Amino acid sequence: MKQLKSLSAFLMSLLLMVSCSNTDKEDLEVKPIAASGEISSFFDKHLPSQSSTPASDFSFGDKSECMIINSVDELRRSVSSQIDKLPAIDFTKNTLVLGQARMSDPGFSFKKQSVTINDNTLTVHLKFEKNKGATPTVITYFYYWGLYDKLPEKPTDIDLNIE
């Protein structure tokens, strides 16, 4: 009987230690950093906030897409060959997130974006707000970009949130 009590006490203490030592890492959420005037001006000029057709200055198709850009070569491949001058981005320290969200109508406002990093993936979170009032039913592309401190290269998911 004494051995059974000792074994029970040992198992209970072991269970307590395991339950208190949670090794799961929290997901890390990061927000875009301030971009230079040159970078902001480039995207203001070449990337509309919304359009009824995919942006011709970038290599987007006709669906929602997100590009995680970590080099000048990747940026060059994402833009039209008619754009000669790219903004100076230090890709040793930064990552550019660039994309389009295909929506059912133009009645949305883009509110914010962030990226969550976990062990397996990057998740780009996009938050839109539904505007009040009637809007025509026409496919509309919303565009976004964000400059981040260097992000790890991992598979990417998109989380589109409409409020």
Predicted regions and their residues:
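Exposed, flexible binding/inhibitory loops of compact, secreted disulfide-stabilized domains
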Residues: 20-163
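Sec-dependent bacterial lipoprotein signal peptides
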Residues: 1-18
